[in-house]
Amino acid sequence: MSTNKEEEHQIVCTQDFLRQYYVSESVSIQFGLNNKTIRTINEEEFNNAAMCIMTRTNYPESTLKRSASTYLLNSYHKKPATLSLPFVFGDTINLSEDMEDNNENNLLYSDTLYGDDSLTQRGDQVVYKIDTQEEDSSFTLLQSEANETRPLSSSSTPQILQSDYSVVMQEGQTSNGSIFQFSSP
């Protein structure tokens, strides 16, 4: 697959999964848009989204479904809630090959849910660089988050997930692009 094809698929996967499969027409107000609700998705939509991610990451289907189904079946109605899914999007290469048999794989498998996490202190776009031989190698962990219509508590403290990094996606107003943000211990 050519680089152009990979980049095209990466964009489609990100937008289709986060904007269509997990949310209604507009994503949560926490992402900078207007709709505060998150909807369930049917089995066909979930399978399409799962296949889209697996195509990019080459991770086993069972790993993806364990994380995603935990959210879809048990937690979508518990608001606020945050889900960490095993997304990996490389800028120029498929990083699953570079990270194979590496303890850093644990970063990709966190499906711990936590609630009432304020996004107000998270600002800049982040692409976390991995120390590999490829200078352009990078990955971004994505999360899908939904909150109740009530205001977020400014005193709430986000809990660190099972992995070392917790990454939250928030929509920015720069041409409606996505800003991927992270917090580390």
Swiss-Prot record:
Disordered: region residues: 146-168
Biological process per Gene Ontology, one example term: meiotic DNA double-strand break formation
Keywords noted in UniProt: Activator, Meiosis, Transcription, Transcription regulation
Domain of life, per lineage: Eukaryota
Phylogenetic classification of the source organism: Eukaryota, Fungi, Dikarya, Ascomycota, Saccharomycotina
Naturally occurring in which organism (per UniProt): Saccharomyces pastorianus (Lager yeast)
Record flagged with keyword Transcription: yes
Function comment: Potential transcriptional regulator that is required to activate expression of a number of early meiotic genes including HOP1.
Pfam families: REC104
Name recorded for this polypeptide: Meiotic recombination protein REC104
